[in-house]
From Swiss-Prot:
Keyword Cytoplasm: yes
Organism listed in the record: Listeria monocytogenes serovar 1/2a (strain ATCC BAA-679 / EGD-e)
EC number: 5.3.1.1
Keyword Isomerase: yes
Pathway assigned in UniProt: Carbohydrate biosynthesis; gluconeogenesis; Carbohydrate degradation; glycolysis; D-glyceraldehyde 3-phosphate from glycerone phosphate: step 1/1
GO cellular component: cytosol
Family the entry assigns: Belongs to the triosephosphate isomerase family.
Name of the featured protein: Probable triosephosphate isomerase 2
Keywords linked to the UniProt accession: Cytoplasm, Gluconeogenesis, Glycolysis, Isomerase
Amino acid sequence: MRKPLVGINMKNYINTRAQTSEWLEATIPLLGNFSDVDTFIFPSMGTLETTANLLAGTSFGFGPQNMAPEKSGPLTGEFSVESIIDLSANYVEIGHAERKNLFHEKTSEIAKKIQLALDEKITPVVCVGEGIRANDTNELKNALKKQIEALFDTIQVTQFKNVVLAYEPEWAIGKANSADTDYIESAHQALREIIRELGGDETLVRIIYGGSVSKENAAEIVRQKNVDGLFVGRFGHKPQNFADIVSIVSKTKG
């Protein structure tokens, strides 16, 4: 049984230690009754230490929004996995569409980051998703298969279970509406089929949906058989909104 999972990516919206403290201090008490759902936050990078201090001793996971493909070295401006370990972080976001589109991250670099995170026992939340809406399920599966095969080409299939896939269709990120639920379920089902075809155990891999998640669509999305949780964006900037999403997932999947 895959445990439901809800995460939030703060991107560069809540950027000060004071803002992050305020959000966490308001949110943590609201999550006390939802032990059947795992939660995590990717805070603005400059607030990671504040986040680590406030989440110490809780089950609320956290980590950076990116990491270097190497442990250490001449990588100016990157964030080392050694720093992640030092902070006792347990997640790392890898391959977000904005990293690829704005900073031109290559698939080969993303694949190295995934492997490094797995080697260091940190859970990589790997973002995948097509750039434009597919016309049918075959087109959708083919688009996702190209991504998964490239990203996981050198990773042992026995490690797939330690990865979280965040399905985020690029055309739905930051938009007014999410993808429709039939489309979302088709994508999640396709991802499981791809994992199985590569030799992995698709029943062990958690796949969550991100892209214009809100209170209004959360329940319908997580009712889908192959959806294990949600990856929240700006809607979760209000602590009660994030807690409401966790509550919905708990009631629907817990």
